[in-house]
């Protein structure tokens, strides 16, 4: 199953990222002229190929959210709603899309829901990676799976269009997961890579007939450790209103090498704020910070406090003598006096007064 994924790029960044994969990307005008493929007789004329809405990067895309897909017929990026609604739907508001945000590979030729999209409306869903939860008893632990090289990731998808509502929707195809990921989940999205046999076949608009055996052989997921990676992330991804970049950061220290430089910069910034007197002790009550961010800031503040106390102790040892003599008291008074408040005259008076008591106190000590 794939119920959450991340797309860490704005709409303006995506065309170049596809070109980096040597994929052609048409402009809205070019795509519009090619939108009527010979096999799409039932499609509506003048279909929009690029949403008018500007897509912003989101690190927690869930069903019913909009995201980017790449259409092979128009060779354009289009933003559609996640959770496929078939073209024959009479009332979109009553259609339960939670049942259709994934399509099982082995059922594509067995279900009326999937047969037509599989024949004529195939696509690739763009993402930075997807989330999966490992369940042990009542405990669910989220993991993030992405490309090891950090490049844009593609998974096999299908789309449909409801004309009366002018609504494009898509689904993500999943299959039996590879042995290497069975411990995490039994199913996995069908990952595609441009330039491979599976990509070319799935994105071939001239191919409209499939057998289940052919589809399974073509799209069955495998886990190539040299290309894919996974690591544990914060539980905050479970809440759909959380969408920040921190959701895809490794939670465990051994997984965090790729983020170490950024973390050091963030901690240095906190230390600088601490030195300048900016009060960061309110982290605990800051509802905008959760999970790992709170932990990191608390750790930074704790370290700052310890370093500050240690520094003060060292300064005391080097600048203030041990207690006992009158001269010690003089130096302590000099160190503690504020010239702006007391004035230089009062300071000199105190120093002289304490200095005059030195001999008498010294005699008492000798007498004892």
Swiss-Prot record:
GO BP of this protein: protein-DNA covalent cross-linking repair; proteolysis
Cite the active-site annotation. 2, 132
Cellular component terms (Gene Ontology):
chromosome; cytoplasm; nucleus
Region described as Disordered: spans on this chain:
25-48, 270-368
Pfam families registered for this protein in UniProt: SRAP
Predominant subcellular localization, coarse grouping: nucleus
- Phosphoserine PTM positions read 338
Any idea which residues bear Thiazolidine linkage to a ring-opened DNA abasic site here?
2
Residue spans of biased composition, Basic and acidic residues class: 37-46, 281-296, 304-313, 326-349
Q: Give the Enzyme Commission number.
A: 4.-.-.-, 3.4.-.-
Q: Where in the cell is it found?
A: Chromosome
Molecular function (GO) terms listed?
lyase activity; peptidase activity; single-stranded DNA binding
Report the activity regulation comment. Answer: Formation and reversal of DNA-protein cross-link depends on DNA context. Catalyzes formation of the thiazolidine linkage in presence of abasic sites in single-stranded DNA. Mediates the reversal of the thiazolidine cross-link in presence of double stranded DNA.
Q: Which UniProt keywords apply?
A: Chromosome, Covalent protein-DNA linkage, DNA damage, DNA-binding, Hydrolase, Lyase, Phosphoprotein, Protease
Q: What does this protein do?
A: Sensor of abasic sites in single-stranded DNA (ssDNA) required to preserve genome integrity by promoting error-free repair of abasic sites. Recognizes and binds abasic sites in ssDNA at replication forks and chemically modifies the lesion by forming a covalent cross-link with DNA: forms a stable thiazolidine linkage between a ring-opened abasic site and the alpha-amino and sulfhydryl substituents of its N-terminal catalytic cysteine residue.
Family classification: Belongs to the SOS response-associated peptidase family.
Quote the record's domain comment: The N-terminal catalytic Cys-2 residue forms a thiazolidine linkage to a ring-opened DNA abasic site. Glu-132 catalyzes reversal of the thiazolidine linkage; self-reversal is favoured by duplex DNA formation.
Among PANTHER family, the record links this protein to: ABASIC SITE PROCESSING PROTEIN HMCES, DC12-RELATED
Name of the protein: Abasic site processing protein YMR114C
Q: Which organism is it from?
A: Saccharomyces cerevisiae (strain ATCC 204508 / S288c) (Baker's yeast)
């Amino acid at each position: 199953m794939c119920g959450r994924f991340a797309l860490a790029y704005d709409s303006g960044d995506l065309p170049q990222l596809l070109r980096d994969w040597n994929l052609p990307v048409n402009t809205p005008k070019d795509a519009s002229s090619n939108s009527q493929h010979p096999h799409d007789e039932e499609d509506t004329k003048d279909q929009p190929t690029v949403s008018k809405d500007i897509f912003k990067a989101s690190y927690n895309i869930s069903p019913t959210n909009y995201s980017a897909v790449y259409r092979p017929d128009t060779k354009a990026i289009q933003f559609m709603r996640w959770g496929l609604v078939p073209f024959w739907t009479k009332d979109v508001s009553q259609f339960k899309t939670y049942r259709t945000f994934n399509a099982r590979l082995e059922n594509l030729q067995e279900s009326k829901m999937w047969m037509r999209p599989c024949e004529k409306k195939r696509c690739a869903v763009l993402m930075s990676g997807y989330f999966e939860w490992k369940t042990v008893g009542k405990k669910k632990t989220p993991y993030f799976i992405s490309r090891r090289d950090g490049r844009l990731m593609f998974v096999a998808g299908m789309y449909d269009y409801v004309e009366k509502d002018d609504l494009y929707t898509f689904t993500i195809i999943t299959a039996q997961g590879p042995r290497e990921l069975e411990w995490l989940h039994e199913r996995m999205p069908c990952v595609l890579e441009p330039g491979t046999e599976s990509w070319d076949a799935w994105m071939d608009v001239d191919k409209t007939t499939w057998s289940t055996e052919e589809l399974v052989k073509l799209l069955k997921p495998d886990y190539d450790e040299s290309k894919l990676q996974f690591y544990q992330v914060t539980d905050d991804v479970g809440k759909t209103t959380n969408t920040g970049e921190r959701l895809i950061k490794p939670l465990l220290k051994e997984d965090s090498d790729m983020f170490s430089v950024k973390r050091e910069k963030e901690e240095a910034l906190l230390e600088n704020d601490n030195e300048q007197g900016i009060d960061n002790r309110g982290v605990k009550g800051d509802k905008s910070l959760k999970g790992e961010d709170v932990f990191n800031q608390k750790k930074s503040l704790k370290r700052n406090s310890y370093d500050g106390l240690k520094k003060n102790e060292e300064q005391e040892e080097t600048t203030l003598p041990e207690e006992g003599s009158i001269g010690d008291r003089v130096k302590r008074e000099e160190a503690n006096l504020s010239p702006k408040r007391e004035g230089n005259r009062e300071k000199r008076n105190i120093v002289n007064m304490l200095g005059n008591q030195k001999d008498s106190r010294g005699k008492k000590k000798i007498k004892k």
